[in-house]
Structures are given as structure tokens and as C-alpha cells.
Amino acid sequence: MNFLDERWTAIPQGLDRANLYPYEAPRINFIINRGKIQKLPNKFKFDKRIPILAIGSNRSPSQLLRKFGKLEIIPVTNIIVNNFDVTYASLISYYGAVPATLWPVKGSKLQLSIIWLNESQLKVMHETEAVGKAYEFVKFDNEVINFKSSFIIKGNIFGYVSKFGALNFGSKVFEVRALSAIKAKKRMLKSINQQKALKFLSSKILNISSKKNIFDFRNKVISDKNYRFETIKKL
């Protein structure tokens, strides 16, 4: 793997920030070392770091660089999660993406990441995840995790789940959709990309799904905070 490839470090701007969500992430363990992406040393010491399950954009080096800048050290390791999938949340972000949340799905198995944060980094992450407003900070049961797939983890794993649950794609019965960008080893749900999720959401709110209306809808969500809050209430 080429850690110098700009796709890992280029931070999406403008509408790409929504279109490319949840961004690319290496499928091997790595470390962000003061702005550089490197292979994680085998003898890295995880002492006093808190394991946080990353289900969406937090898996991506570019998103971690956006949130923490180029002065921090953040190790990221792979992990297998059982009986859950990553679905679209019943939310829309301030930059116009339909974000992710974890949803229980019996039989599902997918590869996600653990980001190892110190106390000060965790405070920053809480702020970026809008804890208490958009997401809740939770502790996961150990049976969710396939520990054979991870670095040594002592104690619990924590993470963020949508305060508003998963987005309902059904008309008569409740249906959720997985993020196609998150690859599963075993997936039980239908999956769609970000563009289709946004098209559905704009159609649900506006009852129209032309490209122009989707574009206008997203721009209004980005520019008008109150409109975004009202939209979330309708989901």
C-alpha cells in the first residue's frame, strides 16, 4: 500500500465533502503521525488510549486530519463487528451528507476500524460528533466484537450512534439501507451509495427528486441551519 497516495490525505471540500462521504480508508492498520499516514508499528503502546469504534468517516485518514490537524498521533486498527451493519442515520449533516449509524442486523459481519484516542482527542471527537444533539456516546457489549480480528483490547470499546436512529427508507414497513461504501464480509441488508440516499431524502421532504431540486435542497440544508433542523424533525 502506498501511504503517500493523496487519496488518503486530500481533505474533500465543497460538495465533495458530502458526495464522497464516508471517504476512503485503508484496509490495513495505520497511524496518523503528525500529518503523515504510516504503517502502524507492531510495538506501538496503546497505554492510556481509549478504543473508539469508527463506523463512517472517522475510519478515513482525511476526516481525522480535518478534525485533529497535523500535530496529533492517532493509531487506527481493523476490527470485525458481528450482528451489526452501518446504515444511513435519520440525520443530515451541516455539510449536506446523510451520515452513518450502527444498526443491529443478525448474521451481519463487517470490517470496521478502531481509532485509539487519548483524553484530549476524545473531547475533540465529542464536539465534532455533536454528542447529545446528533449522536450519543455509548459503550458496546464485548460480544459485538470479534477480538481475534483486533489488536489487544483491554476493557470496553466505545463509539457513537445516531440519537435519531436509522433513516426509514420504507413506505409501509420500516426499512433501513446500508452504506455501500462500507464493505461487509457478510451483509443482510440492501445497500446504496450517498447520492441515492440523498435523492431519497430530498424526495421524502420535497416530493420531487430531480437533479436540480436535490442540488437546491442540499444547498439550503448547508446554508440554513434552521431549515436543516426542521428537515431532521420530518425524517
Regions flagged by a language model, labelled:
Residues M1-L235:
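Glycine-aromatic micro-motifs
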